[in-house]
Amino acid sequence: FEAAGYKDAFQVKLLPADADPMDVRYNLVQWVHRSTRGWSYGTSVVDPRTGEILKGKVTLGSLRVRQDYLIAQGLVGDFKTDSSNVEDMMGMSIERLRQLSAHEIGHTLGLPHNYVSSVHDRASVMDYPHMLVELKNGKVDLSNAYDQKIGEYDKWSIIWGYQDFPKGTDEKKALNTIVDQMYGKGLYFLTDQDARPEGSAHPQTHLWDNGVSAVAELKRISEVRKITLANFDERKLRTGTPMSS
């Protein structure tokens, strides 16, 4: 919103203790505890007469963080010789939660998925991001697993959706100009209709991917997988943890 010229237009605060979560005056991020996997959601209450978004509600499940931590543990954990990277593993999990929160809040603001953003250096939080697992000096590295900022595409989306125009402006023409400017920056938009149906499999709309070339990324991630599996043993578990965990 700041990129669109609106300072402090978007703020996050703790819900007052006496507030009703169903109160339409409050946009809500709700934390839900789950013992099994479940989706996170970003939904809106919309005025059917005008399309105006009246209230946004995000639901984030607790199990996601545990799953991401276990993935990180399997990739970089080494409790036999070095347990100091526990904070790094938890940090990666929190980075994923941060990205997911922005993604679901984006939905409440009216933003759809954009699966082509991974081709453009993670240009949108509205993609389905695969953690960027890298190899450094022959070891798995998660320091750049998830982007920690709003993408350039997201800024253009908010500008397009929320910009106020001076009286007398040809709004349709002005909105098309914004799209042209975005395209001029090398940013594009491809969503579910381009990615999910069998007849709409655009080659750059893979879900959960990184990079420009699917073939090059497959070769890169296969090398990561090879090294990860070669080091996947009991060292990944804390002392005293059952193997069945």
Placement of each model-derived feature along the sequence:
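Metzincin-family zinc-dependent endopeptidase catalytic domain
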Residues: 1-108, 131-135, 159
